[in-house]
Amino acid sequence: MTVPVFYSISDDFTKYAAVSLNSLVKHANPETDYTVYFLNQDLSGQHKQDLSDLGIQNVHVKFFHIDDDIAKLYNTELGNNLFGACTDSSIQYVAKMVKYIKDVLALDPKKYINSGMLVMNSKAFRDEHFINHFMNLLERYHFDCIAPDQDYLNEIGEGRILHLDPRWDAMPNENTKPLKNPGLIDYNLFFKPWHFKNVQYEDYFWQSAKETKFYNELKAELNNYTDAERADDREKLNHMLLKEDKTEQDPNNWTRVKEREAVKL
């Protein structure tokens, strides 16, 4: 069995991808074969080599922080579900976001998933023409969304999402205690350990970073990131949430469209 793994990165994200790939290699089952594909447009030759050098005999590099053998995740039985994902724990204590999910998306916030990590039922996507359905919705309504890809996936997949153990998409959240055994860490939105100190789960990132050639560069990036830049990141999050007021009044928001036609597959 070969487990395919896909990354989508630009050249400037190489150092972060290298930390993740190194962690994957360290936790890979030696009895399983893995092929890691990097989807890219502008990776330099040197960075391709840097990533290739991290491969081992059973992890081949072909161009959400991984702390377990992801073959366990890949082997999830999806049944008739379109994809498997974890509930988005990062929004449960954000009142504006909870209101947006209830009033604009007409979904249950406790079932709203994070799209940063998906186990996809590719056959169902093809057989049921998921992409055609998505493009039809996009072209007809172009919904104004706070989290575009995530909102579309939640809406189209409603009722056919397998909710996975939260350890497979552990997200830093100052309102909750960290999971004791995270399998995959998603440094969601703006609070990255290479920009902010004391980020939940940061130890996993730096432990893996030390084993790559980018450790000193990443540390320098953290130390050079200014308080003004951190304040700007926080303001970007607040700006995102302002969309809730606007979209609630939109005559073609998800709630109103769903009253007229089927959105989910």
Locations of regions flagged by a protein language model:
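A glycosyltransferase accessory/donor-loop signature
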Residues: 1-9, 13-19, 114-115, 120-265
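Residue-level recognition of the N-termini of beta-strands and the immediately preceding loop/turn
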Residues: 3, 32-36, 61
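A short acidic (Asp/Glu
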Residues: 16-19, 46-50, 69-70, 95-96, ...
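Short, acidic, metal-binding catalytic loop of nucleotide-sugar glycosyltransferases
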Residues: 23-32
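Short internal beta-strands
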Residues: 34-42, 85-87
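Active-site-proximal specificity loops/subdomain of glycosyltransferases
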Residues: 40-67, 72
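Conserved donor-nucleotide/metal-binding helix-loop-beta segment in metal-dependent transferases, i.e.
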Residues: 68-102
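A recurrent flexible, glycine/aromatic-enriched loop bordering the glycosyltransferase active site
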Residues: 105-117
